[in-house]
Regions:
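Non-catalytic cap/lid and distal C-terminal segments of serine-dependent acyl enzymes
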Residues: 4-425
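C-terminal beta-sandwich/jelly-roll accessory domains of carbohydrate-active enzymes
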Residues: 378-548
Length: 548
């Protein structure tokens, strides 16, 4: 009882402090103050991100203040230019932890010195209190993922010469920043190939109080970040690197954490001990999925900048050995060559090689990012992949999927290739494929589920894409009124699978004219709409085809 009272009083104090700092033009991280820029943009000016101020702090370090529509306010971003100049630079997205800000890695973590002999452009955006999530603060929503994964890449593309190929997009962070790095990697495995987490909580469901406190420092109310961990479990899993670990197959993963103590002291750093246990759990989870990774549970180390500076340096040494660029003494490192790669290991800060966790891979026909880099069928050419998500709208490897649903759920978009895919979950779906098909040619679509089979034709648009809709099998288990049927939906409905098969129609020639149904807001008057019905009379898809 006493602990509950103290926690409630502490929560109120955190919210009061955050509100007071916001009114003064300051945000929850240190003393970041943008009041010198004047009032925040309004109207048309607030619809797009834009640079409000920029400064040159050193030969390599630049500081920007950017207005973000996703956040509804101006935040800071620091950028380190490559130590080894490049015509087109790979990018490290380096994230700070809770209680820090965009200046912390250069002010306290020696990021500028550690990257002096590297080819990377390092971008260090602000992350508020460090939730790396959408946070409801009063009537506002701070959408940090959109700022980090959409607006920051647009900012980089417009102002710097950078390479956006997945192999040249790297994520790293300390504490909550490492959580953000792993989460973004799991959300977008088609956009990033490297991710590192130093002393990070990677399983939110086993660290609920920590995430709740971080959200309150942002100004949110208690238990509003992802909702109740029991009633809204799917929302927590959808934001969990641990829950979405299957998506990390084929990426280069680095995990590290200190023990929470020093050799000369018996005192324990409980926070570092907690993230060490989280790292152990996450490593075990990756092993169970057959995902290669590097896990370094240090024998000493606290939750502080001494440890994180060491870990960043160790990770950069690993990159120097595994990636193809010239080091400070101008000796080239052969791509994927040397003792490190042949032995499948990573570097300790001392420079010694330790073995990677290389769990046996489960038997699967799925082609992941790793297979693609090693010469297997490319996903862009129709190679197979699978993807786990909690989003109702997502884009992955050129596929765009929209799911209409009543509640949060975890969806498996599985066995995806030019020949079709499978979907789990409830509601209805709309899918637009990449340009894998011959423009104008007719294809036979077959939607197979527990309720039956629905077959209909569809023509590829001028970009070689197919667009179609359908009902998911579990829709019949998704009642509006809670009760036993709701429990049945939770335990059974979401596990049911709907399969879509795509095959080229026999004896069909491409049409002279095609209608791009996915991009056109209007249909040519000469086109006729053919409605195909199924699933007890419900309209499943309308295929628009030119009149003969």
């Amino acid at each position: 009882m006493r602990r509950s009272i103290l926690f409630a009083v502490g929560a109120r104090a955190i919210r009061s402090l955050t509100a007071a700092r916001s009114h003064r033009g300051r945000f929850p991280t240190l003393d970041q103050n943008s009041s010198f820029l004047g009032p925040e943009p309004r109207g048309k000016e607030a619809r797009k991100w834009h640079i409000r101020d920029k400064r040159k702090l050193s030969n390599r370090l630049r500081e920007f203040f950017i207005y973000s529509p996703a956040l509804g306010r101006t935040v800071g971003v620091r950028v380190l230019l490559p130590g080894i100049p490049q015509e087109v630079s790979p990018v490290i997205h380096l994230y700070h932890g809770g209680g820090d800000d965009f200046r912390s890695w250069t002010d306290f973590g020696a990021a500028e010195e550690l990257t002096l002999d590297s080819p990377y452009l390092v971008v260090m955006p602000d992350a508020g209190a460090g939730t790396y999530s959408r946070v409801a603060v009063g009537s506002e929503v701070h959408d940090w993922p959109t700022f980090h994964t959409k607006e920051i890449p647009e900012f980089l593309a417009k102002n710097f010469s950078v390479d956006f190929a997945p192999d040249n997009q790297l994520l790293a962070g300390l504490s909550m920043g490492g959580y953000g790095a792993m989460k973004y990697a799991a959300w977008h495995p088609d956009r990033y190939s490297w991710a590192a987490a130093f002393s990070s909580p990677l399983d939110p469901l086993s660290a609920v109080p920590a995430f709740d406190i971080i959200a309150m420092r942002e100004g949110a109310k208690s238990m509003t970040l992802f909702g109740d961990p029991v009633a809204d479990r799917n929302e927590w899993i959808a934001n969990s690197p641990y829950g979405l670990a299957e998506n990390l197959q084929g990426l280069h993963l680095w995990l590290s954490a200190g023990s929470g103590s020093l050799e000369e002291s018996k005192d324990r750093d409980l926070l570092e001990s907690m993230v060490n246990q989280q790292g152990e759990r996450f490593s075990a989870r990756l092993n169970s999925l057959g995902i290669r990774h590097s896990w370094f549970p240090r024998t000493t180390g606290l939750h502080n900048w001494i440890s994180w500076e060491r870990e960043l340096g160790a990770w950069l040494k690993t990159l120097r050995r595994q990636r193809d660029y010239a080091s400070s003494d101008h000796r080239s490192v052969e791509r994927r060559g040397g003792d490190l790669e042949r032995r499948g290991g990573s570097l300790e800060p001392s420079g010694s090689i330790v073995e990677d966790h290389d769990a046996p891979r489960p038997e699967s026909t799925t082609v992941n990012n790793s297979d693609r880099r090693r010469g297997g069928p490319r996903v862009a050419d129709g190679g197979e992949f699978s993807y786990l998500t909690g989003h109702a709208l997502f884009d992955i490897h050129g596929w765009r999927v929209e799911i209409s649903r009543r509640r949060a759920q975890i969806v498996c978009f599985g066995s995806v290739s030019a020949a079709g895919f499978s979907l789990t979950g409830t509601g209805s779906f709309r899918v637009r494929t990449p340009g894998l098909y011959e423009p104008g040619r007719r294809y036979d679509i077959s939607v197979v589920g527990p309720t039956g089979t629905n077959d209909y034709p569809q023509r590829a648009d001028k970009k070689g894409r197919l667009t179609f809709t359908g009902r998911l099998a579990a829709a019949m288990h998704d009642p509006i009124i809670p009760g036993k049927r709701t429990q049945h939906f939770t335990t059974v409905g979401q596990a049911e699978v709907t399969t879509v098969r795509i095959a080229s129609a026999k004896n069909d020639e491409p049409a002279v004219k095609t209608t791009d149904v996915s991009d056109s807001a209007h249909v040519d008057a000469k086109s006729t709409a053919t409605s195909v019905y199924g699933y007890n009379g419900h309209n499943i898809v309308t295929a628009l085809r030119p009149s003969e």
